[in-house]
């Protein structure tokens, strides 16, 4: 299955420990396509259907998925955890994700 940056995919996140987001849920692929093309792992941000107004949570309104991308719970997963691809988010959402990623990890 070809998987690209900023696509929403269904991922089995179990097993987890403590406060990590768990269960099978939609996630946003964060890793760049250069990595996605060659590696068996992907960097993802889980998507939750309910969220408080945290600066690291970005609202996503995909075709089949609505919720908040949880940037503070980014993790790396094996491709075998992915069961479905829901498609890419909007350009406006991509810009917001990039802004929050930069603020979180660069600035």
Each model region followed by its residue ranges:
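Conserved functional hotspots at enzyme active or ligand-binding sites that engage polyanionic ligands
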Residues: 1-107
């Amino acid at each position: 299955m070809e998987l690209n940056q900023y696509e929403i995919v269904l991922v089995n996140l179990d097993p987890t420990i403590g406060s990590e987001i768990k269960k099978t849920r939609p996630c946003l692929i964060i890793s760049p396509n250069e990595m996605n093309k060659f590696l068996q792992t992907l960097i993802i941000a889980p998507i939750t259907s309910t969220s408080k107004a945290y600066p690291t949570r970005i609202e996503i309104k995909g075709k089949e998925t609505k919720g908040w991308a949880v940037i503070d719970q980014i993790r790396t997963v094996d491709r075998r955890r992915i069961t479905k691809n829901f498609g890419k988010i909007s350009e406006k959402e991509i810009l917001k994700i990039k802004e929050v990623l930069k603020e979180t990890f660069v600035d």
